[in-house]
């Protein structure tokens, strides 16, 4: 009898909806980037469309790439036509953007883990290399080669800088975004904290640009404060909005960078020392909290690992699609597989077919929140293909936003109990047959 497997099917939106959405997003960000150049400043405008295309390539299968390239390019062209005339269109630049996006997406896929692309500083450095260094340098080189001008060095630097800033501002956000992140903001506290931090950061950044010397130093402190207060996704969103606001202010009023604001320094000459101490103090406390939390997590993991590993009954952490994530020795002995072998299997493959449907029904109730735990007797295949009985107890661990993370399963060997029940049942059947054959009546007197 063949072992069966079960996969969770997720209904995805129609691909056409993806392409239309990408085209609209590309249109909006292209419009913003081109608006910066309308002010006639020497500031290299932020260029977001390449980063949008790069993220879309990274997140979608290769068969979608032609449609993504077409929809994003149409969004760019529509924004250009809206602000300028059709004669100003330069399809060479659009083609270079596509080349950069393809190269960046391929590099990001090679350099970053798929499920959680930004887990540490090393991942961020690889992201910067794959999106904000190599593709912009390649694009700048192609611009100089294919569209030579009077000042190729200036064109190269402006192109590289605008692409790099856009990538660092937008790509982390695009790589991290998952639909279930939006569910977190059903928590009023997180929503309020995120909006309050955004409002404070934008307001103080605006005031810094208008009235303070070295405004970017103050903005760095504000962004560090935002990063400390908020989760990763919300922090990157604040970084993006702050960069867009500040760039718009600089494009509208170039004198913001040229004005020394000596009047403030004459009253507060020691202000630079405050700027030295604030980031240092913030990072000190952040690192202390990080080390303390890491120590606490390590101790908790050690206690849990020991409790699981030395348990007399089988225990396992099971993914939401049925894969065995972690198993203890008792379970491995019960099923006859090693831990490495079990990681390549699912519980659906090892479950007796007659028990699988009932088990999956309970799993669905657990995921939907109808029940918190369930237990049942079920049969498994062991390594030799024999059927073994187990008492299964399952509970679900959820993320803070309520999304399921993994199951905790306790699997107790009840083979001996089932054999005893079978022997007792056979014995009672024999006694009943003997009594019927001998004409013996049995009754109870109270």
Locations of the language-model features?
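PAS/LOV and related PAS-like sensory modules
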Residues: 298-324, 329, 333-334, 420-445
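Sensory-module boundary signal marking interfaces of small helical input modules
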Residues: 290, 297, 400, 414-417
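Cytosolic signal-transmission helices at domain junctions
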Residues: 122, 285-302, 429
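Short helix-perturbing small/polar motifs within transmembrane alpha-helices
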Residues: 4-45, 51-150, 170-238, 246-252, ...
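PAS-family sensory domains
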Residues: 286, 403-413
């Amino acid at each position: 009898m063949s072992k069966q497997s079960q996969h969770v099917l997720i209904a995805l939106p129609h691909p056409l909806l993806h392409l239309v959405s990408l085209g609209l997003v590309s249109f909006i960000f292209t419009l913003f980037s081109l608006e910066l150049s309308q002010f006639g400043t020497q500031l290299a405008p932020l260029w977001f469309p390449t980063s949008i295309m790069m993220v879309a390539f990274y997140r979608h299968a290769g068969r979608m790439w032609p449609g993504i390239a077409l929809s994003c390019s149409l969004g760019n062209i529509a924004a250009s036509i809206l602000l300028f005339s059709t004669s100003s269109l330069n399809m060479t630049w659009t083609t270079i953007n596509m080349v950069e996006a393809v190269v960046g997406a391929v590099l990001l896929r090679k350099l970053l883990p798929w499920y959680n692309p930004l887990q540490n500083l090393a991942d961020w450095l690889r992201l910067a290399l794959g999106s904000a260094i190599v593709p912009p340098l390649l694009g700048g080189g192609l611009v100089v080669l294919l569209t030579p001008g009077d000042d190729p060095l200036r064109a190269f630097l402006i192109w590289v800088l605008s692409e790099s800033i856009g990538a660092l501002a937008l790509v982390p956000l695009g790589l991290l975004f998952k639909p279930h992140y939006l569910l977190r903001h059903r928590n009023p506290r997180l929503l309020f904290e995120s909006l309050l931090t955004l409002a404070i950061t934008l307001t103080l950044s605006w005031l810094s640009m208008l009235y303070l010397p070295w405004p970017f130093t103050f903005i760095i402190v504000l962004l560090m404060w935002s990063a400390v207060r908020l989760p990763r996704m919300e922090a990157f969103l604040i970084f993006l909005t702050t960069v867009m606001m500040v760039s718009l202010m600089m494009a509208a009023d170039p004198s913001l960078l040229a004005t020394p604001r000596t009047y403030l320094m004459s009253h507060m000459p020691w202000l630079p020392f405050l700027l030295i101490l604030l980031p240092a103090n913030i990072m000190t406390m952040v690192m202390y909290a990080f080390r303390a939390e890491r120590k606490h997590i390590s101790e908790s993991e050690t206690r849990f690992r020991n409790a699981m590993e030395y348990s007399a009954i089988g225990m396992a952490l099971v993914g939401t699609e049925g894969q065995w994530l972690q198993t203890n020795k008792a379970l491995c002995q019960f099923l006859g597989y090693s831990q490495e072998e079990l990681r390549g299997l699912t519980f659906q493959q090892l479950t007796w077919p007659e028990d699988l449907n009932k088990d999956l029904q309970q799993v669905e109730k657990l995921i939907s929140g109808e029940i918190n735990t369930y237990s049942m007797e079920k049969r498994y295949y062991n390594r030799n293909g024999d059927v073994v009985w187990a008492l299964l107890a399952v509970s679900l661990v959820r993320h803070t936003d309520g999304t399921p993370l993994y199951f905790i399963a306790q699997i107790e060997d009840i083979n001996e109990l089932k054999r005893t029940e079978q022997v007792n049942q056979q014995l009672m059947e024999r006694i009943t047959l003997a009594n019927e054959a001998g004409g013996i009546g049995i009754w109870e007197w109270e």
